[in-house]
């Protein structure tokens, strides 16, 4: 079950909460007409929901294919913004990263942390796993998330799969200390420089 199973979609919301690029439109959610926000560039729909107690209200990304939601957490940058989206396995999780959650403003942000911080063996590079025990598209990064509260030191960097305001998806590295992000580029440093 989703952690949002006991959340309720609110029929209207304040459109000033939306970043540039999203447009407000009516949407039929489970037979009810509600306001939604839609980013055509990325085919992303936001709904405003809250808990049964009327708390923890906010915009959430709605995935119609499995009737699930995830917190909408935009990270603002110099020329736009990025926000975490559901990980699609077309792009392998970078080597040496382990699944976790970023504690961000009472929101749930699925992310990855550098495996060395977890005191666990290094994860296998995506695509090099034992094919007999893993399902197609599955990697060691798909294991149960590591709680950052259980670590000896809090991570300073979190890797997340996200989308920018132009609808482009990629991995992004969030610097917890500086409050900044950048597109993640994995570099091959295994060769010697002469």
Residue ranges and their predicted role:
Residues 1-193:
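Soluble mature domains adjacent to a membrane tether on cell-surface and organelle-surface proteins
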């Amino acid at each position: 079950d989703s952690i949002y199973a006991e959340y309720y979609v609110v029929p209207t919301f304040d459109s000033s909460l939306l970043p540039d690029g999203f447009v407000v439109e009516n949407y039929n959610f489970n037979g009810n007409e509600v306001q939604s926000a839609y980013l055509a560039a990325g085919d992303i729909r936001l709904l405003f929901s809250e808990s049964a107690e009327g708390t923890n209200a906010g915009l959430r990304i709605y995935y119609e294919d499995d009737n699930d939601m995830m917190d909408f957490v935009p990270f603002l940058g110099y020329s736009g913004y990025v926000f975490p989206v559901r990980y699609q396995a077309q792009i392998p999780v970078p080597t040496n990263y382990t699944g976790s959650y970023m504690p961000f403003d009472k929101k749930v942000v699925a992310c990855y942390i550098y495996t060395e911080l977890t005191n666990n063996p290094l994860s296998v590079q995506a695509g090099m796993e034992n094919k007999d025990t893993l399902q197609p598209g599955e990697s060691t990064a798909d294991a149960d998330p590591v709680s950052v509260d259980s670590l000896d030191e809090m991570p300073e960097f979190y890797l997340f799969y996200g989308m920018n305001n132009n609808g482009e998806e990629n991995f992004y590295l969030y610097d917890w200390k500086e409050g900044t992000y950048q597109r993640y580029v994995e570099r091959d440093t295994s060769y010697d420089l002469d």
